[in-house]
Structure formats: structure tokens, C-alpha cells
Amino acid sequence: MLNIFHPADSATFYNRDYLNYDLTNYDLNMTFIGRTDELEFLESCYTSSKAQLVVVYGRRRVGKTELLTHFARNKSHIFFASPSASKNEQLAAFSKQMFEAGSPAAKYISQYADWESAIKDIINIPTKEGERKLVIIDEFPYLVKSDSSLPSLIQNLWDHALKDDNVMLVLCGSAMGFIEKEILSEKSPLYGRATGILKMLPMPYWDAAEFVPHYSPADKALTYAILGGIPHYLVQFDPDESVDTNIKRRILRRGTALYSETEFLMHQEFREPATYNTILQAVASGATQLNDIAQRTMLRPQAASTYLKNLIEVNILEREFPVNAKTVEASKAMRGLYQITDNFFRFWYAFIAPNLSNLEIGDIDGIYQYEIEPLLHDLAATPFEHICADWLRRENMRHTLPFRAQHIGRWWNRKTEIDVVATDKTQHRLLVGECKFRNKPIDIPILRDLQEKTAYLGATEKHYLLFALNGFSTELERLAQDDPSIRLVSVEQLYQ
């Protein structure tokens, strides 16, 4: 039976020496943050009575390697980190690990002749009682790039040998488009062979907060607005330093990992990084529709659409639709808005890219004081809306909302927009919310404005939520106490 895992909660291991991490010397005392559901999924595969072929994939930096290393830490296993090298070099490296794991073939050969004999020999790896032959191949797409026949070869070996043995073979990769097209699609030789599929997502805000455990809830939310749920980014911040100090020292300073991160990833993922940089800067500056993006980047709409599709494939961009959009309407793509999904990319293209020249000469304090600090809360407004929507999803799972929500998201039309909306199946029951990431309390006019907006949504039952960074006015608190349809949620409550 195919086991597809769609994680609701996620996090990753917590290592401040991440950049120098050595897979062969895993520290068992290292703190590991979250990923509870993902680990349980992998453990269920491991303890299954049947052979397992598991595909783990997700964007770069999301924590795949750390999850798999943590999962395998107390088990006999082979963890092969595929190098970007020639086929022969890759095969030699894999042979070495197989022989070190006890393959009897080591007595007769110094290296496997080909991938067929190497993969087939997994069956002969010795195991202890109660364990299974666990082989993890990280960055599997690197191997396929050197030998395109590998998926067909594994398919044949799986069908005729591996699927009847005590094997758990894990194929892991960061090239999401490649994994989905070349391994999981119907055209792939491996289609239908995977017994488990784990698409790893960025961690939710409540797990990301564990990277800065001593921060106030407001600073945890601000950190998430800057770095998002990508563990490699979060681990760069020093939890004993303030948010502004971390921004200056860990993002704005030349030579740091985050300073050059977007440039590195764009060159890793795309052949034309300059074009993609231009598109992302246009979206970050407010261009959210295809024609607007095409005009700002001086691209033909058809060409711009292709670039945008590629950015969506690597989870840097998304096309967002109103929460009540019908499937047919969404497929026609008439009202969709392009948004940068990665919080750090949004921060980088909004603040770093336009100021690179001055940062290159070391004007860190000036750029922060005049270009970033005055606009930081404005930039955090959209990520804060996502935090509030995720809080609603979690509360929905906890059954604490007035009704069971079927859809949760943002809503807009040509005249107005609502930050977060939850609807039931019939869309007759609504929960609408306003999210304010600002330094003054929310007062009654904000509520009245929200109530007026709901007139565009024809529902028979309406509930109102107000999310505040800095609390609520006394008058609004009194009103909410007397009206059960109004709920006030502070930033502190978001982190409870």
C-alpha cells in the first residue's frame, strides 16, 4: 500500500555548526527540534513487515538530510551522500560504503562494476536481529544526472529482488521538479513502486520559535517573518542576541551564509539567475499579476509565465486564490496573485537586493537604520497573516473553532480584502479575521471595518477574529466580553 505523508507540523535538528556538519560524525546529544510526524512516518515504514521504497523530497535547506540522519542514528544503516561527480566516482564512493557496511563482495572486488550489481548487493548486507537493511541515498538526482538509466535499473531490481527482501531503500532529493516528474509521475519507471512518499515542508511558526526560545512572542513572530520556516536560515541567528543585531551581523554582513544565500540558490536551481532575480524583485516590490510582472521585467507574458512556473516548482513563489474560489475559476487563473512564499527571499529582495552596493562597502548600520528598520513591520504584515492562518488551522484540528472549517485562507475582490477567512463546506458559516502587526493596540474602528467587509461574503453565521501584535483597546476588550461572536487573539496566545 502506498503511504503518502502530508506533514502538518514540521521542524528539524538544531545544530549551530550546520555548515560544517559531517554525516559520518553525528552528535547524538545534539538537540533535534520537532519533525515528530515525519519521524513517526519513517519509523512506521521501518517497522513494516514489507520491503520499503521511500521517496523523501523537498526544497533545499528544508532539513531532509538532518531528518534522515536523525532517523537512522541508532540503526545499522548506509547513508550515501551522492556527490556531484562522474558516474565512476559516484560508484566508487558507494562501493566503499557498502564494503564498510559488511558486504561480502569486499572480499573479491575493489569496486562494483556497475550500479546494477551495487544496488542488487544491498540484499547481502548483514543485519542484526530485529533490524532491516536500511540504505539512504541522499541527493539521488545527482546519480541520475550521471546515469539516466538508474530509475529503470532500480525498478527492475525492485520488482525482481528487493521487494521480497528485508530492505528499506530511501531516495532523497532537493530537485523537486525532477523528483515529481522523473520518479513519481506516471511516465517514470519507478511509478507505483514507492511504498512511501514524504514531501518535506518548511516548519510551522510554533516550531521555528524553538530556535530562539528566549525571545518574546513578538520577536519570535518577527524572526519568523524574516527567516520563515527554513531551519538552515533559523540556525544562523544567535538566540542570545536581539533581532536587530542578528539582522546586522548575520544577514547584512558580507561573508555570512545568509548574505549570499539567495544568489547561491538561484545559481543552483536556474540557468538564468539574473532573469529570476529580476522577477522576484518585481514581485517583492508589489507586482502580483502576470501582466504587471511582465511589464516591470520587460518580458513577454508567455515567457514570464514560464519563469513564474519554474519559481513555483521550487517553492519560492506561489499563486494565491481567494479562499472561496471555485476549482474551475482557479484553474482559469483569472484572479490568482503571485506571492513570494519564502519569507527570507521576500526580505532579501525587498531590502538587500536594492541596497547591495552600499552593503558591499560595509554601510550596515546606515542601511538598517534608514532602509530596513522603518519598514520592517510593514514587511512582516504578510507573514503575520500566514502565522494567523496557521494558528487557525491548528485550532481547527483542536476543535476549538465555532465550526469545522473546510477552507482557510485570504479573500479579496476588486474593492477590498480580508486577511484571513475560514469557511465551512457550505460557505454559509464564516470566521473572518484582521491581522495587525503594528506597535499600537487594535481599537473598535478596526472591528467595524472588518464587519463592513463581510457584507461582500453572503453568510448566515459570522464570527470575527482580531489578531494583534500589541494588544487591544480597553473599549474593544469590553465589547468582546459581551459579544461571543468576537474573539481577540494576542501574539502571546499565538505561541501558547
What do the PLM-derived regions correspond to, one by one?
Residues 1-365:
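Phosphate-binding site recognition
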Residues 8, 19, 335-496:
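A cross-kingdom feature that marks ATP-driven nucleic-acid transaction machinery
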